[in-house]
Amino acid sequence: MNKTSLKLFAIEARNELMEKMRTRLDILGITKNGIEKAKVVGREVEINGSLYPRESYNSLVRKYKQIGYEELVEESAYTWFNRLTALAFMEANEYIDEKMIFNNGLKNEPGIIDNYYDFEFFKNLDSELQKELHDLRDENTANSIEKLYSILVEEKCEELSAIMPFMFKKKGTYSDILFPTGLLLENSLLVRIREEIGKEAPIELIGWLYQFYNSE
């Protein structure tokens, strides 16, 4: 375990995730200066032509009003750092079967994208969401695969919330619509997580990662 490399990664990940959160909030019409009014469309809200779950959006607005913009950026970045590194650690130690972070062979994409339909958490989803996931996979564009991946990660987090509620929250919270983009690109944060955590991650590695992340 190379602590120098871990520290550098954790600090870079923090900065990158915070920037991703700012970008995502901007898309959602949320800035330091306030919140643009969203259009309510049934159980969703429309912002700049895109639809988002109303429950998650309302949770985000409440959080913004409660802690402010900068703290929201910090907290949401830390939330996703914790979740992604925890998933990688659980995979590396075979606590979960799905490859939510690690890839198969030479492919850059996480293995779950190719065989999500084989796993129990997918089979437990309602038929409408299952169809949406299949349609996204069949569309096979960069945007559709990224959306497919974000939904799969969120649904796996939902499943894990039953046994690890301190790490993985149930759907409907503000973090759902702040899923970090660009994770499937080459040299993305996801690739660096794989490199740092590796295939046989000792438990103390996670502790060091969190310590280094919070050292800034």
Regions found by a protein language model. Give the residues of each.
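Preference for the N-terminal adenyl/adenosyl cofactor-binding alpha/beta module
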Residues: 1-216
